[in-house]
A protein has these predicted regions:
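Conserved beta-ketoacyl condensing-enzyme motif
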Residues: 13, 48-106, 221-237, 242
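Short glycine-enriched loops at secondary-structure junctions
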Residues: 19, 78-84, 135-136, 175, ...
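Short acidic, glycine/serine/threonine-rich loops at helix termini
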Residues: 24-26, 87-89, 140-146, 237-239, ...
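Short, well-ordered, mixed-charge alpha-helical segments that flank or form enzyme active sites
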Residues: 85-86, 137-142, 187-192, 235, ...
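Active-site-proximal alpha-helical scaffold in enzymes
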Residues: 103-132, 170, 278-299
């Protein structure tokens, strides 16, 4: 049975920052990023190390913006798309803070917010922690698809893995106007898709399942935005069809509230990103660069975030397995007066 956790005492998002690469800087949200690099290397020699450096820079910026030192962090939870989360561990070990590595594919941002919120809520030991998520286009292409030098043609349904990182400082204390008030882990759902270049379609069913479950207990009229992670053009269309098939008026209402980080991060009419943005850095960077500032000022008062993940690896794809989707969610609210 899937259960929603409603926090009696909210967890506050005290600080946040976003770091991105060349395509992210050229997109419509580029001006909202704290730092971007036209070379996508961030001073490193390899793209894999560059992803770790993005995580380090994002967390460092989030701390500096709030004048917090790393010694004031009790825990870091972080994840990325590289095997064994080496980008996160390699980029964040210098902070000298206890570390939990997470892997939820492109759902890692929301997964991290859930894990850290739960630990802060239930523990007397932890009072403040950081959640960091990253992905790098070139590192992901090399690991999951083909070497960059090969120049393989991409399918129209494929997404563009974001070169981006988002960092969030969470606290038990009321240190900001941004609150996490509820969360729900996702279920692994068979998307009945085997094509790794059509992950938006593979994840759409899990997004529908989480949204449908959540709104059995909650009123959509109280929300300003339902934000999925990286369904892109294809997955978003499927999600809206699924919602309408369930209940036409209900689906129409939710469709008016829905947007997708993969559609916000890039200008699909001008940038060659095919179906839109993807990667766990996609939802993390859109949340930290564009959404949270609006929540902090009260422009957005209640947002439902579902970072959508496609659970697969190169072996499962080569063996013809179905891609499972997962969509954990968190509710972020304005806590001002």
């Amino acid at each position: 049975m899937q259960k929603i956790t409603y926090l009696e005492s909210p967890i506050f998002i005290e600080g946040y920052s976003a770091v991105g690469g060349r395509e992210e800087a050229r997109g419509p949200l580029g001006k909202y990023f704290d730092l971007t690099d036209e070379k996508d290397l961030f001073g490193m020699k390899t793209y894999e190390r560059a992803e770790g450096e993005m995580s380090r820079l994002a967390l460092n910026l989030a701390l500096k913006k709030r004048k917090i030192t790393e010694k004031e962090l009790d825990l870091i939870v972080a994840g990325d798309l590289q095997n064994q989360c080496v980008a996160s561990s390699g980029g964040l070990f210098t902070f000298g803070v206890p570390f939990l590595g997470l892997y939820g594919a492109c759902s890692t941002c929301t997964e991290g917010l859930i894990v850290l919120s739960a630990m802060l809520t239930s523990s007397r030991t932890y009072k403040r922690g950081a959640c960091v998520t990253s992905s790098h286009n070139c590192a992901a292409e090399r690991q999951f698809r083909t070497p960059l030098e090969y120049g393989a043609q991409r399918s129209p349904t494929s997404g563009w893995t974001a070169t981006a990182s988002g960092a969030f400082i969470l606290s038990k204390e009321r240190t900001s106007n941004i609150m996490i008030t509820s969360f729900m882990p996702g279920k692994a759902i068979d998307g009945y898709i085997k094509d790794a270049s059509n992950m938006g379609a593979a994840m759409a069913l899990s997004a529908f399942d989480s949204i449908d479950t959540f709104f059995k207990e909650n009123d959509p009229d109280t929300f300003d935005l339902i934000l999925t992670g990286d369904l892109g053009r294809v997955g978003s269309a499927i999600l809206r069809d699924l919602l309408s098939e369930k209940n036409e008026s209900f689906g129409r209402k939710l469709s008016t509230l829905h947007n997708d980080c993969g559609l916000l991060l890039y200008d699909l009419s001008k940038q060659d990103v095919h179906a839109g943005g993807s990667g766990c850095g996609c939802s993390a960077s859109v949340l930290s660069s564009f959404i949270l500032p609006k929540v902090e000022t009260g422009e957005l008062r209640k947002v439902l975030l579902l970072s959508t993940g496609a659970l697969m690896n190169t072996s499962s794809i080569c063996q013809g397995d179905h891609i499972l989707g997962i969509s954990p969610l968190v509710t972020v609210e304005y806590g001002g007066t």
